[in-house]
């Protein structure tokens, strides 16, 4: 199979459309994006190290990706199950739980990185 650059660009375009379709419409994603701006701003102000930036960016990416997966799962469940069903609710809860695990882990990592900077003030 030959590589098709135009097809690759279209694929990236579809991915961006997917992300943008959630921004401003999903409350939890909006919360995580606001937290991202705050964390990145704090990183610049406090002058965190390259290694710390690497960990912070990885945490941000994991949480945002988890939130996007959660949104996709919720929409798919809504499409497949038009009426309330206990398993559909459980699937949504499990997906939301995965986001919570990622977000809590990221918050703890953030505290580990940022607290030493504030204790020196």
Language model features with spans:
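Short basic (Lys/Arg) and small-residue
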Residues: 91
């Amino acid at each position: 199979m030959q590589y098709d650059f135009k097809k690759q660009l279209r694929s990236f375009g579809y991915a961006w459309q997917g992300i943008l379709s959630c921004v401003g419409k999903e409350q939890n994603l909006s919360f995580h994006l606001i937290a991202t701006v705050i964390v990145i701003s704090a990183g610049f102000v406090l002058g965190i190290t390259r290694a710390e930036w690497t960990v912070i960016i990885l945490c941000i990416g994991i949480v945002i990706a988890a939130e996007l997966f959660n949104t996709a799962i919720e929409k798919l469940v809504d499409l497949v199950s038009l009426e309330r069903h206990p398993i559909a609710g459980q699937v949504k809860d499990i997906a939301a739980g995965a986001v919570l695990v990622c977000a809590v882990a990221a918050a703890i990592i953030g505290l580990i990185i940022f607290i030493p900077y504030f204790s020196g003030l």
